[in-house]
Amino acid sequence: MSKVVVLNDKLEKAGELDLPSKYAEVNPHNLYLYVKSYLASLRANTAHTKGRSDVSGGGKKPWRQKGRGGARAGSTRTNVWVGGAVAFGPTNERNYFQKVNKKQKRLALERALADKAAKGALFTADSLAIESGKTKDANAVIKKLGVKDALIVKDLLDEKTLLAYRNLANCYVVDVSEVNAYLVSVFNAVIIEKSALESITKEG
């Protein structure tokens, strides 16, 4: 069974919690589908080429059909001409959206949490608030745990905690309503407030 490391007020290991056993039984393909969909949604879709209907000019036949000894041509804007259109090029009208239903999103998050717990990289504490709002104090939390980078999940994200963490390149802090399987997977460690963890497991 996957274990969640429980931290005390001094961020020292104080015990362990069990994740629901069904989390580890989730098919990892659900996690793959969600991550693929999430990354696809981030694509900017800026590459664009002009097709035959987009380029200007080329309405006049450049030379007569027969009698010149050369290849026939009906326009100077086909894809074989310099200054002509592009055949099968990328357009900014392409839609990269990939549908993932609510159940798959939920299963993906469960599997991502189970994977982190199996590696001993899922932590929980009563409070993760940084009341001072200082980056120095937020950095001390990460150093204390000895992790390379971390996702911080709060039950209710307050402004001071956000200010404290947002200037750290190796940290990302989110409200529990915004946490997803991709964020859990991409960080080496995940630290969740106990109340936030309860709300996640309750939904499942």
Swiss-Prot record:
Any GO MF annotation of the entry: structural constituent of ribosome
GO biological process, one term: translation
Any single GO CC term annotated in Swiss-Prot or TrEMBL for this entry: ribosome
Statement: the UniProt record of this protein carries the keyword Thylakoid: no
Pfam families linked: Ribosomal_L4
Record key words, sorted: Ribonucleoprotein, Ribosomal protein, RNA-binding, rRNA-binding
UniProt xrefs under SUPFAM superfamilies: Ribosomal protein L4
Disordered, as annotated region: 49-75
Role, per record: One of the primary rRNA binding proteins, this protein initially binds near the 5'-end of the 23S rRNA. It is important during the early stages of 50S assembly. It makes multiple contacts with different domains of the 23S rRNA in the assembled 50S subunit and ribosome. Forms part of the polypeptide exit tunnel.
PANTHER family documented for this protein: 50S RIBOSOMAL PROTEIN L4, LARGE RIBOSOMAL SUBUNIT PROTEIN UL4M
Subunit structure, interactors included: Part of the 50S ribosomal subunit.
Family, per entry: Belongs to the universal ribosomal protein uL4 family.
Name of the protein described by the UniProt record: Large ribosomal subunit protein uL4
Gene encoding the protein: rplD
